[in-house]
Structure formats: structure tokens, C-alpha cells
Curated annotation (Swiss-Prot):
This is Septin homolog spn1. It comes from Schizosaccharomyces pombe (strain 972 / ATCC 24843) (Fission yeast). Residues 26-38 have a biased composition (Polar residues). Residues 243-246 are annotated as: G4 motif. GO terms for biological process: cytoskeleton-dependent cytokinesis; mitotic cytokinesis; protein localization. CDD domains: CDC_Septin (cd01850).
Amino acid sequence: MASMVLADGMPTVKDDSTRSRGSDVDSFTSTDNVTQINVEAAISENKNEEKPIQDNSEQEFNPHVSIIQRQLNGYVGFASLPNQWHRRCVRQGFNFNVLVLGESGSGKSTLVNTLLNRDVYPPTQKSLTGDFGVNPEPTVMINSSAVEIVENGISLQLNVIDTPGFGDFIDNTDCWQPVLTDIEGRYDQYLELEKHNPRSTIQDPRVHACIFFIQPTGHAISAMELRVMLALHEKVNIIPIIAKADTLTDDELNFTKEMILRDIQYHNIRIFFPPTYETDDPESVAENADIMSRIPFAIIASNTFVVNNEGKRVRGRRYPWGVVEVDNEEHSDFPKLREMLIRTHLEELKEQTNKLYEAYRTERLLSSGISQDHSVFREVNPSAKLEEERALHEEKLMKMEAEMKTIFSQKVQEKEDRLKQSENELRTRHREMKAALEKQKADLIDHKNRLMQAKAAAENEKSKRKFFK
């Protein structure tokens, strides 16, 4: 069986017949001696002296700024952490929820069986094809089938969600609405579970990937398919595939892929592309580039074994002009789809689902009137904290200084008012005293004049008396 990438991006099963990013499993099963050699090799690349990182206290906080690299003098043991995580993942198992979305007869059940290399949906079961009778009602149903798959001791709980009736009617107006409602309902269910349980114990019901079947018309994507992708691309990881690609010639297939990608880019539809990380080795980068170049995947699915021109039994389809092999990358993009979906990027799909869920959760809580104080989640930087405290202290000092200036101004104003009042009182008293003095002076002058007149009259009387004598 092929290798599988399971929880947290950790490959747990490896097959020598397939080379993939799951080859990293060798490091998980290595012995202590090999681990010791890897640690010593990593240590030898560092310099002997300590390397303090330059202080960037005035810059934006970086959690790696305060790290000081030191040379290890011996084996510590943290190199075995991947082994511990591997044992935990194997013990708990994994779950993966995939939505297959397309019209009836697109080959959805065949693709699922081919993808897992077993009859998850037997030919007699019509869960992915639907049976509506003679006069079906224009209704899209949502069916979910769970199956537990064990490969080399690794348990995978796979939930396949199908949509019988999708796109099968003359009037397909809003045929995607039940699908969107189901996706959002699973988000709401997960949100409700979060309120009462730790995330590590929750059985994740969210849709991790949506395999969207595009009809092989040989032309561009249809208007209905475009509307469906526009309605779902913000809620789920869309993986577009061209169903029954063996019905198209090479030129028609290349033209169809080009037109689909052009429409997706023009309408800003977000589909899932394998992410590339700086730590990826050149082989992984090349594999990612090869996978991205195949999107949308041209799929040929079959559970039938036929004999090819070389006399080998292979899964495929026989035509009068030759044999089409399912697992041959020259005939079909199915191997790359399986590699991305299960072997290399299963955990990236779940991580991207977390991002889509967080966006939905935020929108849902905000619409309910619940807002989050983002300051609670700010990283604590000592230098930034000191700078913040210094700014608060300066603000406090400035406030105290302003208050003191206000009080001082009030005191000065009150003093000036009292001085002006005293000055006015003194001026009033001065005027009153001056008026009193002027009056007293006038009285004295009047009294003097009367005395002078009396004296003159007395002297005149005296002189008259002497004359008569």
C-alpha cells in the first residue's frame, strides 16, 4: 500500500514502491545510535562560542530575538520527540472528511474506491449515484458514509459525504445551497463542541476537502459549476478535477485546463494548492511544483484490472485503440491527486480547514454580538513592555504637570483677585480720606475767613471808639 500522511503532517507508513515526502518516517523509526549521530552532526554545524542575537528592542517583537545558541556537550534527548508524537498519533488514529461533489454519473464512487484501493462502495450500493425514481423532486440530499481503514496498523476514520441529486435537474437554481448549509452546519457543530470539550478530544465533523467534479465538455467551466465554486470556496478546500478525462483528446484536455484556471483566477476563486515551506528539501519543492502543474486534475478512475500492451495486469480501461492505465501519470493525473490528498498533504488540508473555520467562527461570533479583545493575545516583549510602561509614566507625569499648572494658575488668579480687591479698597479709602481732608480744609479756610472778618470788624469798632473819645 502507499504511504499515508496522517495527523500533524507526520508520515507513519512507508512503501518502498512509492517515493514521497513520507520518507521522513525513517527518522521516526531510527535507533538511538542513529539519533545520536544526527544530533552530533547538527551540533558540529554550530560555532563553539555563544551567539547572542543582536538586540532589536526598538523593532517589532520577534520571539527568536532572545535566543542564544549554545553548543551541546552531550545527547539531551529532545531529538526523540518525533518518535513520541508518532506513537501518540498511531495510538489515537486519524479522521478525514471528504466531500465528493458532482453530477450523477461523474464517477464519484469509482474514484473513492480507486483512491483507497478497495471497495468502500460496492457496485450494488448507490450512495454516490442516487436513485430518484421516475419523477424525482428537485432536491439535493446529503448522505454521509463512514468507513474505518487500517493500513499497517494505522487507523483512518474516513467519512465520505456525497450529494445525490446535485446538478441532475433542468432547473439547478441554488442547487449548492444544501451543500453550503451542511458545511456551515458542521462548523456550527464543531463550535458547539468546543464550548464543552477540549479540541484534542473532539471528533472533527468538518469537511477537510471537497473533490469537485467538472464535466469534461472540452470547453470552459459551466456557469453552474462556476457559481458552485464561488459559493463554497470561502468555506471549504476545493480540489477541482476533470471527471472522465479519457473522453477528451490531449489538445481538448489542455485547453479545458487552461480555461478552467483562467476562470478561477478571473473570479478570484480560492482552490487548494500544496503549500511550499522554506524548510522543504529540493525534492519536496519539485514534487509540489509537479502537483500544482496538474491542477485541475484530469482523472481516470477504474476498479477493473486489464492487461496492458506489456502483458502486465493494471487498473484501467480497455478501448479499441488501446489501454488507459489509472496509475500511469502519462495517462491520468490520478496518482498526483492521491499523492496530494493522502500521502503528502492530508494534514495541510486539515490545517487549511482550521483557518477557514476560524474565519467562519469569527464572523459567526461577531454577528452574535460577541467581540474579542485582541490585546489579550499580544505577545509579551520585555523591551516593548518597558517602553509601554515608560510611555504610560510619561503620560502620567504630563497629566500631573498639567494639573499642577492648572492649580498654580488658579492660585495665582485668586491671589491677583485678592490684590486687586485690596487695591480697590485702598483706592476707595484714599478717595474718602482725601474728600474728608478737602472738606476739613474748606471748613478751616471758612473758619479762618470768619475769624479774619471778625478781627477786622473788631479793629474797626475799636478805632471808631477812639475817635469819639
